[in-house]
A protein has these predicted regions:
Chain B
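C-terminal amphipathic alpha-helical segment
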Residues: 336, 340, 346-395
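Short cysteine clusters
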Residues: 74-80, 84, 143-149, 153, ...
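Extracytoplasmic substrate-binding proteins
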Residues: 171, 292, 322-330, 344-360
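Iron-sulfur (Fe-S) cluster-binding segments and ferredoxin-like electron-carrier domains
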Residues: 82-110, 151-170, 378-381, 421-435, ...
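Short hydrophobic beta-strand segments
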Residues: 230-240, 363-374, 455
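Cofactor-cradling patches in redox/metallo enzymes
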Residues: 156, 240-330, 374, 378-385, ...
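Iron-sulfur-cluster electron-transfer modules
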Residues: 61-71, 101, 105-323, 503-510
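Ferredoxin-type iron-sulfur electron-transfer modules and their immediate structural context
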Residues: 1-138
């Protein structure tokens, strides 16, 4: 299991890193912000922040998808914070930040919200004809997988507790390449295996929307084409910048 | 071409149940060999078209970040599925923006992604077959590149970008669209989309001078190719002869006359439209734009102003500087380029124009935001100026103005249904069905608010509406140009209207 997790992490980091590199290096030859768009760089930062934190466009678009989608993502984030207690050492200055009651209990109950959000999204995928039409098997499977990750996590939290001291030793050992045994728990095995799968498919699937949104030219460009000339490297080269300066 | 049923207009814009394949038969005429070759594309479908298409796709994704990011990022959330006017009007699921993208995305996945190469079924990847190419040809010509879907997508995925890429790929394999490619060819050879030669243009303008003088008693000029003029006006060629476009042109001329501007049109740049964008071709878009730069240099003007046209303004505002800039030879104290509405509103604010709003009292107006202006450009110096300028001008020259349902205006405006290179008779069915959401919103204000006319600022919108709204019981003359309204209300110095106004004892509405 240690081995699997490490491989998955490497694939995830390298894969997503390469994708980010690709996005960053691919030029955007034309100014295509969806207007009205901010006219300053600061404005763009705010637009992007609203998009990433509040899902602004989705909110305008469809309240149901927004409710479920937002609920899922925020809960995922909270749950993620809760999990930090497994990787942060108790002597670290970070420890009080991750171990306090607020982070821990929010994170614990967020699991329910996460699963509810995901069930909502899954239900829509089955029930709304339009969404069913655009869904392929992987779209359903991904939701099911996340639901199982959430449910198995909740099981460990609320139903059959696991030995978290041992789990912590396992995780800390992982990063020191000092492989320890996992606590015995089916829920934990399922949980971790699916996280492995999730990390592995991340760079090869629609999960790329996470880095993608930051590179979306319709959202991250400043609306100033008249004031500032925007020219891509390939166009400049191809046309020898064509301008008789 | 009336072998289809006009959809029934309901009280509200509803989301239809899916009817698979209901628009699969809709395809525009394919470009002839010479149309293709004039633009540097193969004359007919090349032998190894699959390979050429895939190479082109690979090339595009390396040069357009939008294309690469959009292909990867869609999560199939479905938020965009009910946002496209063509879907709302046709019920064909492939007209849902995400499904339209998927026509291309499934091929991208199959050939360029790990998942699609090894698990095609799982992720909905498909081989590039002839049937897929046919689907592309059909459905990427049922997208007007209006960007409405991009407003509502959480990642800003713009199906217009995908459509443009798809059309460029189809051009590269030799399967271009006749309407667009023929027109671009005409721009190169004659100077405008309509193939109106210089002589004919001069005649039209002369005729307009006579008409306006007959009407007002003022010798308003419509100058052509005047060297040393201050302003080059670039306007869609439909403004030279189509109704109600031409009344808009008269409006621009009167405003220029009244403000004492020195201006000119150009024979070689007698077209603001640029169909290079519709086919996704940077190359052709640049070539078409270059005429404007060249004309401006040749005539030695100081400013460039664009007439009422939607996609033309997007290209002018957003791309012109990129494509053929920098415009360091123009007067830098004005926006480059400027929209005619920016000019007119500026003058109205300064108070240089005398307006008699009562001239427009027989109408109650509403305004159709053109998609490309609304979501692909700006007017003025603040975001959203593109919504205010036309409304400000209309309200300055008309007493009765009402907006349509906010779900159908400003950034959420519906395309007229004829944009993006679809304004051709061989696509009549999709055009009529695509105008349904706008027609619905219009009908509602007509019935509830007494609206009689709808103003537009785009040559394509005006042509599309006058042709398709009659299918829903409206009349052609209910569509007006914004500058037509200005023209009606403008009281020029020394005009018959001025004499009448000042001669009678009733008070005038001078501001
Ligand atoms: S709204 Fe965007 S992410 Fe959602 S299905 Fe449509 S294109 Fe995909
Ligand atoms: S760009 Fe406009 S026409 Fe094209 S898919 Fe999006 S909403 Fe439909």
């Amino acid at each position: 299991m240690s081995f699997l997790l490490l491989i998955a992490l490497v694939v995830f980091i390298v894969g997503v890193g390469l994708k980010i590199k690709q996005y960053a290096q691919t030029p955007a030859p034309l100014k295509i912000p969806t207007t009205p768009a901010p006219v300053t760089q600061t404005g763009v930062v705010f637009r992007m922040a609203r998009e990433v934190v509040l899902f602004e466009s989705l909110f305008k678009s469809n309240k149901w998808i927004w409710v479920f989608g937002w609920m899922f993502h925020v809960s995922l984030l909270l749950a993620f914070f809760r999990h930090l207690r497994y990787v942060v050492s108790p002597d670290s200055f970070m420890w009080p930040l991750v171990s306090n009651v607020i982070v821990q209990s929010f994170g614990q109950y967020a699991g329910f919200a996460m699963v509810i959000g995901l069930l909502g999204l899954l239900a829509r995928r089955f029930l709304v004809e339009r969404i069913r039409y655009i869904s392929s098997p992987s779209d359903y499977l991904m939701l099911v997988m996340l639901i199982v990750i959430g449910v198995s996590g909740l099981m460990m939290s609320f139903v059959s507790h696991i030995d978290i001291v041992q789990l912590k030793m396992f995780v800390m050992g992982l990063f020191g390449f000092d492989f320890q045994n996992l606590p015995e728990s089916t829920a934990l095995i399922v949980h971790l295996l699916l996280v492995v799968v999730l990390l592995l498919i991340f760079p090869f699937s629609k999960l790329l929307h996470a880095p993608g949104v930051f590179f979306s030219p319709t959202r991250n460009q400043v609306d100033n084409p008249r004031e500032k000339r925007h020219l891509s490297a390939w166009a400049a080269e191809k046309y020898n910048d064509h301008v008789d300066k | 071409m009336a072998d289809f049923e006009t959809p029934e207009i309901k009280e509200f814009i509803g989301i239809p149940a899916l009817q698979e394949g209901s628009m699969a038969h809709s395809s525009p005429f394919i470009a002839y060999t010479d149309h293709q070759e004039a633009l540097g594309y193969p004359g007919e479908l090349v032998e190894n078209w699959q390979q050429v298409a895939l190479d082109k796709m690979d090339d595009l994704r390396s040069r357009y970040r939008s294309f690469q990011v959009f292909l990867d990022s869609c999560v199939k959330c479905g938020a965009c599925t009910d946002k496209c006017h063509y879907f709302l009007g046709t019920s064909d699921p492939k007209n849902m923006p995400v499904a339209r993208q998927d026509l291309l995305r499934k091929v991208y996945r199959r050939y360029f992604t790990f998942a699609g190469k090894y698990f095609p079924k799982l992720v909905g990847a498909e081989d590039l077959t002839e049937a897929v190419l046919d689907d592309w040809y059909s459905y990427f010509h049922q997208c007007s590149q209006c960007r409405r879907c991009s407003v509502f997508c959480p990642y800003g995925i713009d199906t217009a970008e995908i459509s443009m890429a798809a059309r460029e790929i189809m051009d590269a394999v030799g399967k271009g669209q006749k309407y667009c490619n023929e027109i671009i060819g005409k721009v190169f050879t004659v100077g405008n989309n309509l193939g109106l030669p210089g002589k004919a243009l001069a005649n039209v303008l002369e005729g307009l001078e006579e008409d306006v003088e007959d009407d007002t008693g003022v010798a308003v000029k419509f100058p052509l190719d005047v060297k040393g003029a201050d302003i080059l006006l670039v306007t869609p060629s439909a403004d030279f002869f189509a109704e109600p476009h031409i009344d808009g042109l008269i409006g621009y001329a009167k405003v220029f006359h009244e403000t004492g501007a020195s201006w000119t049109l150009s024979t070689t740049a007698s077209e603001a439209g640029n169909f290079g964008m519709f086919i996704g071709s940077y190359e052709n878009m640049r070539r078409v734009s270059m005429r404007i730069r060249d004309a401006a240099k040749e005539l030695g003007v100081k400013r460039i102003i664009f007439g009422e046209c939607g996609h033309a303004w997007r290209i002018a505002y957003s791309f012109l500087n990129t494509l053929v800039g920098p415009f360091d030879f123009l007067d830098q104290s004005y926006p480059i380029p400027q929209h005619i509405l920016e000019y007119t509103w500026g003058e109205l604010e300064k108070g240089t124009l005398r307006i008699n709003k009562e001239e427009n009292d027989h109408m109650t107006l509403t305004f159709h935001d053109s998609c490309n202006v609304a979501r692909g450009s700006r007017m003025g110096d603040y975001p959203g100026g593109q919504f205010d300028y036309p409304r400000n001008v209309i309200k300055a020259v008309c007493n009765n103005y009402v907006d349509m349902d906010p779900k159908t205006t400003k950034e959420a405006t519906f395309c007229c249904g004829g944009g993006g290179g679809l304004l051709t008779d061989d696509l009549m069915e999709i055009r009529v069905k695509g105008v349904l959401p706008r027609a619905t919103a219009l009908k509602s204000v007509v019935e509830n608010e007494g609206v009689t006319h709808m103003a537009a600022i785009c040559a394509i919108c005006k042509s599309q509406f006058t042709k398709t709204l009659p299918y829903y019981g409206f009349t052609m003359d209910q569509i007006v140009s914004v500058h037509q309204l200005v023209s009606e209300a403008l009281v020029m110095k020394g005009s018959e209207q001025e004499a009448e106004l000042d001669g009678t004892d009733g008070d005038d509405t001078e501001e």
